[in-house]
C-alpha cells in the first residue's frame, strides 16, 4: 500500500507535461526516486514522518511543481524530479548491475565512482543492506546513496559517512581509523601517479584532518566535532575518496584528478548549499525523535513517508 507521500506525488503525475512519454520501466521507479529526495532533506532522522508544513514550504516541492512548466528537455536536466533525471538514474543502476539480479554487489558498486574506496563501500553495504539480499544494494537504497554522495555537506550525509568510518562503533574517529581507510586512498592514487606515495604522507594528512576538525579531545574526532567545525564533509571525504583527497590537496594550484573514464556516474542535481542548510535549519526546529512510525495515513501535522 502506498504511503502518504507516494500517494500525493502519484496524484500529481498526470499534471506534469515533462513526464509524458515516460517508459514503463522508469515509471515503476519514479516514485522511489521522487520520494527519496523529500525523505532525505525533510526526514533526516529517518523517523518515517515529515511535517506537512515543511513539505508545503520546501523548495523541493517547488522543484517538483516546476515540472508543470513548459521547458525544453535540456532545461529540465537540473531538476531531480524530471523524466531526464529519473531515466538517468535507472540507466545508471542497470549499467552497474552487470549480472542483472536487481542488486549491486561490492564489485558492481565499486564502478559507481572511481574515487570511493572499496573498504568504504564494503562498510556501506554492511551497514545499509540486508543479509537476505546477500548484503547487496537494491535500487531504492542506491537512490538514497546517490543523494548522500552528492549532498555531503548535509548533517545526514556527515552522519552516514561517520557511521561507516567508525568501524569499531566507538563514537569517534582516531588516527588508527584514519590510517586504516587512507591507505586504500593512497593505493588508488598510485594507479594514477606512480610517485603518489612520495608526494602524500599519511602523518601530514592526519595532522591536516585534526586541524580541520579541531576536536575537543585532541586524540579523537567525534560526530559533534564534525558538525561544529563546518568542514565535516571535507574531513570525511578525504579519508574515503581518492579524488576528493587529491582535489582538496591541490586546491590552491587548481589541479583536479580527471577520472571520468573510470566512473559511470555524472553529477545528479541536488539542492544548492544555501537551500540544503535552510532545510536543515527547518528540521532542527522540528525534532520528532522518539515518535513511533504511524500507520498509512496522515496524522494532522505529519505525513508518513
Residue map of PLM features:
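A positional/structural detector of protein chain ends, strongest at the extreme C-terminus
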Residues: 302-305
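Serine endopeptidase catalytic core focused on the charge-relay Asp
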Residues: 154
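C-terminal interaction modules of eukaryotic adaptor/scaffold proteins
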Residues: 199-298
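Eukaryote-specific, cytoplasm-facing alpha-helical/coiled-coil scaffolding segments in long proteins
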Residues: 32-34, 38, 61-68, 115-119, ...
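Amphipathic regulatory helices of Ca2+-sensor modules
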Residues: 1-25, 50-65, 103-120, 136-150, ...
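Core solenoid repeat modules with strong leucine/isoleucine-rich periodicity
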Residues: 48-55, 63-69, 76-79, 83-109
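Conserved, structured regulatory domains from eukaryotic proteins
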Residues: 6-45, 56-66, 71-82, 158, ...
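Primarily EF-hand calcium-binding motifs
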Residues: 1, 24-49, 85-101, 120-147, ...
Amino acid at each position: 500500500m502506498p504511503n502518504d507521500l507516494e500517494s500525493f506525488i502519484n496524484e500529481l503525475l498526470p499534471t506534469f507535461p515533462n513526464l509524458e512519454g515516460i517508459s514503463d520501466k522508469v515509471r515503476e521507479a519514479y516514485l522511489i526516486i521522487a520520494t527519496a529526495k523529500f525523505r532525505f532533506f525533510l526526514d533526516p532522522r529517518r523517523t518515517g514522518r515529515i511535517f506537512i508544513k515543511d513539505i508545503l514550504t520546501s523548495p523541493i516541492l517547488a522543484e517538483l511543481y516546476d515540472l508543470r512548466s513548459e521547458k525544453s528537455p535540456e532545461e529540465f536536466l537540473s531538476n531531480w524530479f524530471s523524466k531526464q533525471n529519473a531515466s538517468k538514474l535507472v540507466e545508471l543502476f542497470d549499467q552497474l548491475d552487470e549480472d542483472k539480479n536487481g542488486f549491486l554487489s561490492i564489485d558492481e558498486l565499486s564502478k559507481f565512482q572511481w574515487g570511493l574506496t572499496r573498504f568504504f563501500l564494503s562498510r556501506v553495504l554492511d551497514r545499509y543492506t540486508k543479509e537476505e539480499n546477500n548484503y547487496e544494494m537494491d535500487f531504492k537504497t542506491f537512490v538514497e546513496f546517490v543523494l548522500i554522495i552528492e549532498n555531503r555537506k548535509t548533517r545526514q550525509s556527515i552522519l552516514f559517512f561517520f557511521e561507516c568510518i567508525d568501524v569499531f562503533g566507538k563514537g569517534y574517529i582516531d588516527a588508527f581509523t584514519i590510517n586504516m581507510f587512507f591507505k586504500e586512498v593512497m593505493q588508488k592514487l598510485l594507479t594514477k601517479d606512480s610517485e603518489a606515495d612520495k608526494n602524500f604522507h599519511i602523518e601530514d594528512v592526519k595532522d591536516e584532518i585534526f586541524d580541520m576538525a579541531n576536536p575537543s579531545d585532541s586524540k579523537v574526532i567525534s560526530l559533534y566535532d564534525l558538525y561544529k567545525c563546518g568542514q565535516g564533509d571535507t574531513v570525511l571525504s578525504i579519508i574515503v575518496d581518492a579524488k576528493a583527497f587529491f582535489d582538496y590537496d591541490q586546491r590552491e594550484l587548481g589541479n583536479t584528478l580527471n577520472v571520468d573514464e573510470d566512473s559511470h556516474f555524472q553529477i545528479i542535481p541536488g539542492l544548492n548549499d544555501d537551500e540544503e542548510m535552510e532545510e536543515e535549519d527547518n528540521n532542527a526546529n522540528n525534532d520528532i525523535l522518539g515518535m513511533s512510525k504511524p500507520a498509512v495515513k496522515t496524522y494532522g501535522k505529519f505525513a508518513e513517508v
